[in-house]
Each structure stands twice: as structure tokens, then as C-alpha cells.
Amino acid sequence: MKRVVVLGSTGSIGQQALEVCRLRGYEVVGLAAGKNLEALSRQIALWKPRLVAAEESLHKELKARFPGLRLATAEEVAALEAEVAVAAIPGLAGLAPTRAAVRTGKRVALANKEAMVAAGPLLWREAEAHGAEILPVDSEHSALFQALLGERREDVAELILTASGGPFLREPEDLAQVTPEMALRHPRWRMGPKVTVDSATLFNKGLEVLEAKELFRFPLERIKVLIHPQAYVHGLVRFVDGSLKAQLGPTDMRLFIQYALTYPERAETPLKDLPIPGVLEFLEPDLKRFPALAVAYEAGRRGGLAQVAVSAADEVAVEAFLQGKIPFPRIPEILARVLEATPIEPLTWESLFAVDAWAREEAKRWA
């Protein structure tokens, strides 16, 4: 029986990962969560994990509900003996647990794009030193991973990420009118609040461009974004002969989570009628309407700590927007200001965490 650790178990990806584990009959040996007491309690009762990590404020109540429960840090949960760790703690808070999982040599099903964006070269160095696998969970990166299988690297001309365009692709004309409630209504995907807002600004796609750059170790200038409102084509690989290879499928994250858990096998799943839309549109992104995508590309050109800084600043800016402190168009403005002020230094674990802390404070100044 495959043993799995789920980091970020009460979030959207974490809960869907547990659904997949239940369907596949896997053993969940560790859970790491935040402050959602009721959801975590249900998971503990169902899975009876060996170790659990949660915010310290929950410890007393968890001990009262589950007297024999062993509490630990997220890093300790990540280091448990298991075949796979699902790394789904959002933001840079998920970086240290992801690193801990990689250092134990297990497969890491990576849903935390910020970890790869901020620390890609460092994580790959750790993975190669410890014999770990890093497989993508993001639908677009899983699509590219699948489309690249069996292909020679020198035959690949471009990697193409698709974006639905979010809820504001065409309206309202004035994005200053956008409220948090409007931004949290994504037309296609079931996701957590932060990534839903990032999808609305297209910064999520910018992070995915940077993730693809680091995950596939591929030149930034050959990674493209196309708006695809139907969200049925998840990623395309363009080859030097002009041909394209695409991965298509329904907008169900469980498929991509499952693939990261079962690869190289595909688990048999009940098939439904093919829901192929009548029309598949592909449009160039409007960088004037969605400048956050342009900021991400600029961070990628600078590389290293610039990617750390914009990722950290975005967490602060999105939270400020959700709290009603700043208007929607202010998010990319804050990212651009922080990027311009980012120091140029070599990327190390020490400089990464230092710039992460600096960028958050810098973003708060502008928020």
C-alpha cells in the first residue's frame, strides 16, 4: 500500500488529494494543516495519521479531541517515511516543508508553485543529492510534463501554458470596480482564495511561467501564454518542425493529483462522455489589462531573488485586496515597485529567506 503525506491537507488541493488517496486505497501517514480545526479533526478521525502539524493555537483542542495524537512541525511531517509527499501548503510558507520532503528522497507531488519559483535551482540540487523526484500537480505543468514524455529536448521549440483568462477577461472595463467577492468567482476551477485572486490578475499564470522555467529548466523566452477561455487544453508543446502536442481534459484537479501519485502508471477511472467544447479559442494575453503577467516575465528575466521578491510581495498584496485595503489594480503596481527595489545577490537558502522577509515589508509599505 502506498504511503502518502499531505502538506496543506485542509486547503483545496489537500482535500482533493485526500479524495484521491481514498479512491486509490492509499495510507495517509501524515497531515500538515493550518488553523481549520474542524476540517483537520475530520481528517484525523478518518485517516488516523502517525503525525499531524497544525497552528499552535489548535494544539490544546486537538489533544483534547484525540488524546493519543502526535503533534509535530510541518517539516517533521514532510520527513515521515512515505512514498509520496503532496506539497500543497500555499505560498513561501510551504517552502521549508517541501525542502524537508525532498531531502528524504521521496517523490514530491508539487502543488506549491511558489516553492519552485523562489527556489527552483536549490530544490533541484537537493533532489539530485538525495534521489528525490519532483512531479508537478498544477494542471498546466502536468500537461506539459505529459506532452514532453518520449520527446527529445532539442526538438522542443516552445512550451505553451494556457489560461482561462479568469473572471475579468472582457469585463468590467474598469478593473478598479472589482471587489473581492467578484474576484473569488472563478468561471472554471475550484481553488483556494489566494490562487483564485492570482488567476483574476493573471499573476497566477506569471508564477506558472516562472515555475515552468525552473521545473523544466527551460529558457524563459521560449515559454508562452495563451488565453483559452474554454479551459479544456491545459498545455501545449510546440516542436521545431512546427507541430504541436497538447494535453486536454476536464477541469478537475484530482486527475492531475492522481497522475503525480501514480506515475508512470495511469489509474483506471470511470470515464464520462467526452465534454469537448464546440469551439476552442486561443488568444494573446492583454498585458495592458493584466500587467501582473508582464511583471512576472520581467522577474524571470532577472531571475533568482527577483522571483522570490515578487512571489512574496504578491502574498501581501492579495491579502490586502481581500481585506478591502487596496483596489484590484493596485496588486500589480505593488509587485512592480517591489521588483524594482529588489537587491541583486546570488540565490542561496539564506538570501532567499532574507529577501522574502524584506519583500513582504516592502509590499506592506505600498499596501
Curated annotation (Swiss-Prot):
Origin: domain of life: Bacteria
UniProt-recorded Gene Ontology molecular function terms: 1-deoxy-D-xylulose-5-phosphate reductoisomerase activity; manganese ion binding; NADPH binding
Alphabetical keyword list: Isoprene biosynthesis, Manganese, Metal-binding, NADP, Oxidoreductase
InterPro entries in alphabetical order: DXP_reductoisomerase, DXP_reductoisomerase_C, DXP_reductoisomerase_N, DXPR_C, DXPR_C_sf, NAD(P)-bd_dom_sf
GO biological process annotation, one example: isopentenyl diphosphate biosynthetic process, methylerythritol 4-phosphate pathway involved in terpenoid biosynthetic process
Pathway membership: Isoprenoid biosynthesis; isopentenyl diphosphate biosynthesis via DXP pathway; isopentenyl diphosphate from 1-deoxy-D-xylulose 5-phosphate: step 1/6
Top-level EC class: oxidoreductase
Residues at which Mn(2+) binds: 138, 140, 208
Record-listed 1-deoxy-D-xylulose 5-phosphate binding positions: 113, 139-140, 164, 186, 199, 204-205, 208
Binding positions for NADPH per the UniProt entry: 10-13, 34-36, 112, 114, 192
Cofactor: Mg(2+); Mn(2+)
Catalytic activity: 2-C-methyl-D-erythritol 4-phosphate + NADP(+) = 1-deoxy-D-xylulose 5-phosphate + NADPH + H(+)
EC number, UniProt record: 1.1.1.267
Described purpose of this protein according to its UniProt entry: Catalyzes the NADPH-dependent rearrangement and reduction of 1-deoxy-D-xylulose-5-phosphate (DXP) to 2-C-methyl-D-erythritol 4-phosphate (MEP).
Annotated family: Belongs to the DXR family.
Protein name, UniProt field: 1-deoxy-D-xylulose 5-phosphate reductoisomerase
Annotated organism of origin: Thermus thermophilus (strain ATCC 27634 / DSM 579 / HB8)
Gene: dxr
